[in-house]
Amino acid sequence: MKKTDDAVKIARYISEFLDVYAPNFLTTSEHTLKSYRNALGLYINFLETESVTLGNFARHCFEREKIEKWIVWLKESRNCSPETCNVRLGSLRVFLEFLGSKDIEYLYLYQEAQKIKRQKCTKKKVAGFTRDAVAAMLAVPDVSTKTGKRDLVFLTLLYVTAGRLDEIRSIKIRHLHLDGKKPYVNLIGKRDKIRTAYLLPKVVAYIKVYLSAFHDGTPDPDAYLFYSRAGGKYTKLSEPALAKRDKNMCRSSTQKVSGCPP
């Protein structure tokens, strides 16, 4: 195969991975999708520093030796931490796995990338919330408003389930089981892994008040618990908007009590 043919083929697969495959078959998390896009963008930037052009862009650009040079470049030229380098490498591996599934001639690239050792990371102590900080944060939403009711339930579920932002965003009505002896919610994680989180009576009461405000009548099992007002009940709330709102509420609670991580 000519190098130019190889270049066109790989470029087409990069676009297909970012625009079609990843958002439809890997994740709905905007953060993860952005991570894939950033990793591939940085890899292309690195290849340009290696004098790679359309004329010599080919499969050899994704071989182990080149990827290892990329990691060094990330550390030395981009000042990336070991943790960030590992995230970038993980994202590139996901693309190379996809590439190998599209054309068996590229499968060896993924197999080589799997052998690259991750960077050693220093374990960091995670700063948690104190009980007072949690109470202060849950007191921020104004429950006299619909938005306040939503924020309270969202924050409560985030805290009591220890779920990720996207797991809470992805809850549908059918994932809630509120009327049994032991009420629970099913959280759908990465690669569609299901995790069950049991709910206390007070949390169940919050959710039922929220349901009456946001899901009139008999809720559709396939509707999102937290949906976009613009997109409707079958469109989940955007991750950036929720993350920004959570930070603002945490900032407000920090003004009232110490113990909130910055």
Would you name each region that the model predicts?
Residues M1-P262:
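Conserved catalytic core of the tyrosine transesterase superfamily
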